[in-house]
């Protein structure tokens, strides 16, 4: 059994969660944030048997779109009164997936 932690954009969570459930893959959503854009993320905790790992990863790829946004402070440097914001186009989205081996689990 594998445990996946998939960090995705909030915009992708509804479609991805629905698609995983359609493949009979259980999902737990955890709200998270981070990255230099400080945008809202969702971390999905997904437990899958080894034989469904490829299906889970392909589903995550299909439903975690990359897109460009324009941000005023893409550098991550805090603004101060004297600073000037320069709009920059930044690619966001996609997924970061951590795959862990599950030694054992049980349900109560």
What kind of feature is each model-predicted range?
Residues 1-108:
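Positively charged, small/polar-rich N-terminal and surface patches that mediate targeting and assembly
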């Amino acid at each position: 059994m594998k445990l996946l932690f998939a960090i995705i954009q909030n915009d992708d969570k509804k479609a991805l969660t629905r698609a995983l459930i359609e493949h009979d893959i259980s999902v737990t959503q955890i709200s998270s944030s981070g990255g230099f854009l400080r945008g809202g993320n969702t971390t999905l905790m997904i437990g899958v048997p080894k034989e469904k790992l490829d299906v889970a990863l392909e589903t995550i790829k299909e439903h975690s779109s990359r897109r460009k946004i324009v941000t005023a402070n893409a550098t991550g440097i805090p603004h101060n009164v004297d600073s000037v914001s320069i709009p920059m186009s930044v690619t966001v989205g996609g997924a970061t997936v951590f795959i862990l081996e599950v030694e054992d689990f049980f349900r109560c």
